[in-house]
C-alpha cells in the first residue's frame, strides 16, 4: 500500500478545512478544532480512513477492476489526468455529463463517434473533404475529446470511482450510488461523509493536497495491478488442485476386434 505520512499531509495542507460557519454536523468527529475561522481537520482520523480507501482501490485493481478518477474542478484537473493516465485508469476532468454511468450505452455511442472522427483524420478521409466540412468535423471531435477523451477506453461501468470534491461531483456520486458502485472520496468539513463508501476527511481545494490524494490513488492502483495473479499460474494451480481421478485420464479402451474381457486380461 502507498505510504503517506501525517507529516506529508501537513505539508500538503490536508488539515485545513472550510470556514467554521459551513461545518457539516456529520464531519464534527473528524474536526480537531479551529484556527481563526477555519476548521482544522484531525489527521489522526484521516490517516486510517485514507489507508482503508487506498487498500480498497488496490484490491479493486488486483481483481482486474477499473477505477474512474473524477475531478472536474480546476484545482483537480491536472493532477487527476496525470495520475489516472499514469496508472492506466479512465478519468473525467471536464463537466460531468449527466448519465455518464446511468446511461452508459448512450455515452458509448458518443465515444464511438469520437473514435470514428479520430480515425477519419488519420486515414486520409479528411483530405477528401472540403475545408468547411473538415473544420466542422474537427470542432465536433474537439468537443467530444474534451468531454469524453478520458473515458474513451472505458468499455464498461467502472468497479469504483475516486472523487476529489463530493459537492462539486454530486451528480457523479448520485449515479454511482444508484448503480451500487463504491465511491472513494475526499470530504471537506462542509460535506456529509456518510454519502460515500470510503470518505477521506481532508482539504479538497489545495492543489498540493489534491496532488497527494491523486498520486496515492494511482500508486494504490499500480500496486494492485502488480499483485494480479498471472493467468498461466492460476491455470496451473487449478490443474494441480483437481481430483486425482481427473489426472489419471480416461481408461484405455479395448482394441477393435477384441472383447473387453480379453483386453483386461492383457
UniProtKB/Swiss-Prot annotation:
Q: Enumerate the UniProt keywords alphabetically.
A: Ribonucleoprotein, Ribosomal protein
A GO molecular-function annotation: structural constituent of ribosome
SUPFAM superfamilies noted in UniProt: Ribosomal protein S2 (SSF52313)
Q: Write out the biased-composition intervals (Basic residues).
A: 248-258
Q: Where is this region: Disordered?
A: 233-266
Q: Give any Pfam family that matches.
A: Ribosomal_S2
Instruction: Give any Gene Ontology cellular component.
Output: cytosolic small ribosomal subunit
Please give the biological process terms from Gene Ontology that the record holds. Answer: translation
Which domain of life, per UniProt?
A: Bacteria
Name the family the entry cites: Belongs to the universal ribosomal protein uS2 family.
Q: Which PANTHER family match?
A: 30S RIBOSOMAL PROTEIN S2 PROKARYOTIC AND ORGANELLAR, SMALL RIBOSOMAL SUBUNIT PROTEIN US2M
Q: What is the designated name of this protein?
A: Small ribosomal subunit protein uS2
